[in-house]
């Protein structure tokens, strides 16, 4: 094989690798951004830090995301709000009773969001939403409202099927949301203040909260 043929024969391989690398960049940037947003918060995270952690230039980052705000929105959609289509489909296909559905909802939320780094987004929003009203409105529309709507559907299903007593859904949803928020805050903040023997076991905590919730909501408990 001639020297010229040797180099020519490798050109397609190099091009393919570069193309694959290019296709992977948005995901790598989102992973890096999630890490830094959770570690440092939104305000303290700089675009050049995200780019450096992803192994690209700042200019490359802005080829994919026009601003830090757009990058944050993409992180939220990738890790949380973009999954509501999947979660609502699970609601439609679920065949068990409503107590089992609520149990599935809370346990699955922990497995898919709460136990992952993405749960730090909740703490970030609680800390910084007031300073970034556009992001607060975005989070309300894409995470809070769809999440509460899904919980309302579960509780309404239970009432319609005669499994749950009549509830004020405007407030009952918070009986489900509040324990999850506490678990996230414990994971990302309060655990630092606790001894090892005081740390919450997430699975046991969720099981305990479910037991209390279902006892209070079930027709048989009234």
Regions found by a protein language model. Name each.
Residues 22, 30, 76, 136, ...:
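Amphipathic, non-transmembrane alpha-helical scaffold segments
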Residues 165, 169-173:
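Membrane-interface starts of transmembrane alpha-helices
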Residues 1-16, 100, 104-108, 145, ...:
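C-terminal peripheral helix-coil segments that are non-catalytic and often amphipathic
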Residues 1-40, 44-56, 63-70, 96:
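Basic, helix-initiating cap at the start of DNA-binding domains
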Residues 75-117, 121, 156:
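Amphipathic alpha-helical linker/stalk segments
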Residues 25, 68, 79-83, 98, ...:
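Hydrophobic/aromatic residues within well-ordered alpha-helical segments
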Residues 111-152, 196-199:
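Short secondary-structure transition hinges
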